[in-house]
Amino acid sequence: FVQHSRKENFYQGILLGILSYKSDWIVRSNRESGEGFSDITIRISNSGTGIVIEVKYAEAGHEEEMVQKALRQIQDKDYGYEFRQEGIRRILYYGIACNKKVCRAEVLEV
């Protein structure tokens, strides 16, 4: 895993395991796109949909702040670039922040 804390890697690993179960989803981790490396990207076969997920560890009570930070990072670093280059028209950005058993997520469709 690229440049992440061990806590972020833990949550990212769990998500990768869950998301990789779908046979028609192409799931990749730490893929270079735009100005950096996105945590998780998913291309849903034959649907024209791409998903970019950024995972953050949050201190207790700071989950919303970290969700917004994750979404800003996706946009600022243009992690959807690769999908647009491939002609994918529907791209979903997920910011996810976790602290122990508490996770908060928000999605933007671009």
Put a short name on every predicted segment:
Residues F1-V110:
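Structural signature of nuclease core domains in nucleic-acid processing machines
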